[in-house]
């Protein structure tokens, strides 16, 4: 879990909040929370994963054809 520790000379709340938000984003806490908000069947997860892989592949092929 991300956490921000302030030094003795750091009393600025805005800087601490910005650092905390950056750590939360880097750790992927919000995306994980959204993903776990509702139960998703394993079959649906597999379908989404397969569709994402296909989309990445088509994007890669399209990019190679442009170059």
UniProtKB/Swiss-Prot annotation:
Keyword annotations from UniProtKB, A to Z: Ribonucleoprotein, Ribosomal protein
Record keyword Ribonucleoprotein present: yes
InterPro entries: Ribosomal_bS21, Ribosomal_bS21_CS, Ribosomal_bS21_sf
GO molecular function annotation: structural constituent of ribosome
GO cellular component: ribonucleoprotein complex; ribosome
Any Gene Ontology biological process: translation
Pfam family, one: Ribosomal_S21
UniProt xrefs under Gene3D superfamilies: Ribosomal protein S8
Family matches, as NCBIfam families: S21p (TIGR00030)
Family of the protein in this entry: Belongs to the bacterial ribosomal protein bS21 family.
Record HAMAP family: Ribosomal_bS21
Protein's name according to its UniProt entry: Small ribosomal subunit protein bS21
Species per Swiss-Prot/TrEMBL record: Nitratidesulfovibrio vulgaris (strain DSM 19637 / Miyazaki F) (Desulfovibrio vulgaris)
Record gene name: rpsU
